[in-house]
Structure formats: structure tokens, C-alpha cells
Amino acid sequence: MAIGPKPESIIGSYDHPPQAEAQTEVKSAAINGDTSPVSRLKDFATDPWLTSTDQPQPDSTTNVPYSLPDSTQDARILIVGAGYGGLLFAVRLLQSGFTLEDILLVDSAGGFGGTWYWNRYPGLMCDIESYIYMPLLEETKNIPSQKYVSGEELRTHAERIAEKWKLGARTLFRTTVSDLTWDDNKMQWIATASFSSNEKKQGSCTYTINADFAILANGTLSKPKVPDLPGIDDYTGRIFHTARWDYDYTGGSPAIPAMDRLRTKKVGVIGTGSTAVQVIPQLARWAGELTVFQRTPGAVGLQENRETDHAWWRDNVQLAGPEWQRKRCENFNAFITNPYRASLEEEDLVKDGWTKHPSFSVALGGARNLQADFLDLAKKIDKERREIGQQHINSTVRNPATAEALFNPTYGWCKRPCFHQGYFETYNRENVRLVSTPGQGITKFTINGIMWGDKEFELDLIVLATGYDLGSLCPANRARLSIHGRGGLSMSQKWASGPATLHGVMTRGFPNLFFPGTSQAGVTANQSYMFDRAAEHIAYIIQNARPRTAASAVNLKVLVEPSLEAEELWAMETVSRARAFAATKTCSAGSYTISARLGESVDESQMARHMPWGEGMASYVKILEEWRKKGDMDGLEVVYD
């Protein structure tokens, strides 16, 4: 049983959001191949972007394999995931002194990019400024074409990183790790992996990977989630998820999404979150009729995109000097987590909807979140945000009833905000209609389309913009694999009473395993920055755990894990700051927050252990930097064999 402050003192309680609507909990199904409970969704688990067969491609950064894996693979460091996170871990390890041969990346996709590999729907773009989101811009000398670039450019950048550091030769694509088990005798992680040479042909093999260290760099936006509602198997039209877009049906391509085959089609979209906000305007341009089914309106702010001016880039970005990207990231973090904007002496470099939305620090944590007047100020700023948003909708959308339905009156920290240039204008088109189902969602699928209440909507195509299966907050469940540490203890068992970690990246009983996430760690809206700081920290730990004595000791096995005292102390430091997120308790079940994801079944003391670092990302990063500067690996036990 976890030890901590009395429950009522941990997180606290606040009033409910303005005009908050009760949401009906809609069961959902993760798309996971043959395990999907919905039979017609099983083909959603296949990779629609595979363009090659089984021919070796030794020089390619996508659609590898260069060869079928042997029955056993050996690696010093196994990285699960080859998106931006996995790439950052690989690069920071190389920069810390490891060799390419020390590293092995695996990913279920057929190429680099993670979420940017799987998602190629029309309208896909970054909603965080490209100059801070696209990692390693300094090292690759890449200049993004726009302030917010397309998904195609984001995926190409992942391939650029892989090519620069020659990571293609040390990556196994189409490879899914299902189990990680610690072998105390070998002092290694034994990974069970399955390799699908061509999912469309169902060619596959199973093998093991023996690794001294393992890093879970799986992203959260790659496993599609769909509503598990009656009738979905009865529907006779075409249906797919935005993360598995079918251009053969719609026409067009990821590069040129001219969906001319939809000219005469009746199209329905379920969802109005971040993905839907991007795809709906594109579908409206091409579909004969477009019906949008909305359960809860998104909080959509204006995104002012523009081409990158190279003279501006030279004068305002490059002249900022070494580490300009990190400085810009941290400037962004400062403005989105501090509603006391007058206290910030520096200039807002990013100047977008995010930095004008500092009340989101209620969900992220921040230096001022524990101050007595913080919540009152956050509410005041958020009220101004809602009023500006409502004015924009009312002045843009011509139909008053539609405008009212599109307005989200709840606090801006309950859901991740959306940003777009032209979303609300879409609802002025004659071929677009909004079906608002306040807090309920659709009733069921039918043979011909969708039923809401007693009205049926006939549709040729249903697009599921229903988000992604985030998994639970347990690292094993989040990575969708089974993890057993010392003595056969499962990660899920250890997490059941609330996590205990050192710095949010390691836990005792699971040596040499690293799992960057949100619990007991700093968070920000820019996930690339979070991965980069975790990669920097973990590379330091692994490098400094290696023996530095005689050359004969180089091949010694190393075991590194937190002490029981150190991880409990870090957990209590997190708990003591958990009330920074008190206002998130008022958010509904379908919200973005950790409180909503954990649900009412988790008591306050456990919930507090799951929270991020309450003082915000800057405080968290400073603590890690000071810990590394000391150089004594405080709180870690290191054993050689």
C-alpha cells in the first residue's frame, strides 16, 4: 500500500466547469488485428502504406527489411519505437558515445515516423510550431517550409534524421514486441518479437531479441480507437479510420489529396477532435454531401500558418546561436504554463494560439500552479479565451444554431485545444451539415449508415475520426506489451498501487528498463521536447553506468535500477505537488486529463502518484540537470557482473 498525505490534502477540489455537459461513456475498441472485437475492423490493423514485397532493400529508410531476422537478435540497447521519440533516443545515445552497432530499433510500422508514418489523412499537419516540434533541426540543417508543416514533411524529416545517422541499417520494421522478460542470470531483457514480412500476405515469423538495456519509445497516437457500437458489422458502405486512410476509395494521395472520387458520395465523419478539425475542411471540398457527427465540440482556436521566410529565419532563428531550438522550445514552455504573463521578461517567440492559452497550465503544471491565487487567475484568463472563441464562431458561422452547437463552453484545460485556419468556415458550405449529439454520440450503425435517435442518415462512406487508444498510464499497457521484471513481477502488478519511479523514467525491480511518460515527469504540449529531455537524461544514465576501468571490463554486464528509498522519495515529491492539477478533477470522463483517464475507481493517494511534476517542465528539467551535474548517480544502484 502506498504511503502518502491524507487524500483530501493531495489534489483538493474545485467547482465544476461552466455549463459542463454530462457525457455518456461510449465503449471503444482498439484496432488490434485478430483480437479486435469488431470483425470488419480486423483489416484496419494491416499497414496500408506497404509498397514493397519481401525483396531486400538495404539502403532504404522505409519499407525495410533488408533481410528476414535470425531466430535470435542481440543488442546492447533495444529501442521500441522508430518515431520521433525512438529517433531522438538513438541519436542522443550515439552522441553520448555509443556506436551504431550498440543500438537496435524496432517498430511495427513499415518505415520511420511513428504517428507520422501511420497518419496520412488529407489535411494532416502539425499543430505545434514546426520550428520547435521537428527535432534536431540544428543538426540536420533543415528549414521547415511553413510555421506548421504537413504530415508528409514531418514524415520526410523522420527519414532525414534516420539517413543522417544511418539508422536504417539498425532498424527492424514490421516488428512488434509483445513481451519483455528480465533474465537475472543473463542480466538481460528477453524480448519476444514477431516480424511480418508483408502483412497483406500474412507472412511472419517470431524470434527473440536479447538486450542489455531496453527503452520504450512507443508513441500514443498510432493505435486507432473506434466506437464499439451496435450495427457496425451490418453497415454495407465503406468505413475506415483516419489513421488508415483509403485513397483508393477517395482518390488522391497523401501528397496531393484531390479526393475526386467523392464528388457524388454521401460522407459522414464521427468526431470533432484534433484530427477531425483538420480532415473535415478537406472532405468538405470534395464530398457531394458531408455530415459531421459531434458528441462534444472541440475548443478550436485560430491557427495562422505561413511560409517560412528565409531572411527572417536567418535573422531571427539562426542568429539566436547554438541550441537556438532548445531555447525556443523553452520559451514556448514558459508562455503556455504561466498565466502571470506580466512577470515574463522575455519575448514570446512563437506567438500563436498555444502561447495565448496559458490557462492550459492547469493540465501541464507550472511554477505558479501551487500559488493561492493561481486558479482564480487561470479561470479569468480562460473566460477571456472562451469569450474570444465564441465571438469568432458567431461572426464566422452564418447559422446561429450551428454556431451555438460548435461552441465549447467548458474550461480549456479539460481537452487538448485544437487550432486551424478555416475550420468554422466549413460549416457555411451548402454541402455540409452538423449533427450535434450533446454528450451522447451516435446511437448505432445501420445497413445504410448511422442512426441518431430516431433519424437515420444514409452514407456511402463513414470516416472514423475517433482518436487513438492511449492505453493506461502503466508503461507496459501504454506500450501494449507484457513486461515482467525480477522474480516474475509484472509491471501492471507494481503499478496497481500507484507508481514509484526515479525521475519518471525507471522503477525498481525492472533494471535497465526506461519508459519515458507523463507520470512523475515533466510534461508540455510539445511532445518532441519531452522525448528529447528524456533521451538526454537516459543516455547519460546508461553511459555513466558502464564500467570505466580496464579495457577488459568493457564487456561486463551492468545492472542499474533505483533504490527503494530513492523511488519512494521521488514519488512523494510528486505527490506533494499533485494539487497543482486540482482543477482537472472537474473535467468529464471523456477529457484529456489524467484524472479522467484513471476514473473514480482510483483513490486520491494513488491518483496523486500518477500525476506529472506539478511545478512544470522547466522545474523538472532543472532538477535533472542538477542531478547529472553532481555526477554521483544519486538514487541508483549499479552492479557489474
Swiss-Prot record:
Binds 1 FAD per subunit. Pathway: Secondary metabolite biosynthesis; terpenoid biosynthesis. NADP(+) binds at residues 125-127, 272-278, 295-296. Residues 49-68 have a biased composition (Polar residues). InterPro entries: FAD-binding_Monooxygenases, FAD/NAD-bd_sf, FAD/NAD-binding_dom. The record marks 416 as: Transition state stabilizer. One of its GO terms (biological process) is terpenoid biosynthetic process. Belongs to the FAD-binding monooxygenase family. In A.calidoustus, the austinoid gene cluster lies on a contiguous DNA region, while clusters from E.nidulans and P.brasilianum are split in their respective genomes. Genetic rearrangements provoked variability among the clusters and E.nidulans produces the least number of austionoid derivatives with the end products austinol and dehydroaustinol, while P.brasilianum can produce until acetoxydehydroaustin, and A.calidoustus produces the highest number of identified derivatives. FAD-binding monooxygenase; part of the gene cluster A that mediates the biosynthesis of the fungal meroterpenoid acetoxydehydroaustin. The first step of the pathway is the synthesis of 3,5-dimethylorsellinic acid by the polyketide synthase ausA. 3,5-dimethylorsellinic acid is then prenylated by the polyprenyl transferase ausN. Further epoxidation by the FAD-dependent monooxygenase ausM and cyclization by the probable terpene cyclase ausL lead to the formation of protoaustinoid A. This is FAD-binding monooxygenase ausB. It comes from Penicillium brasilianum.
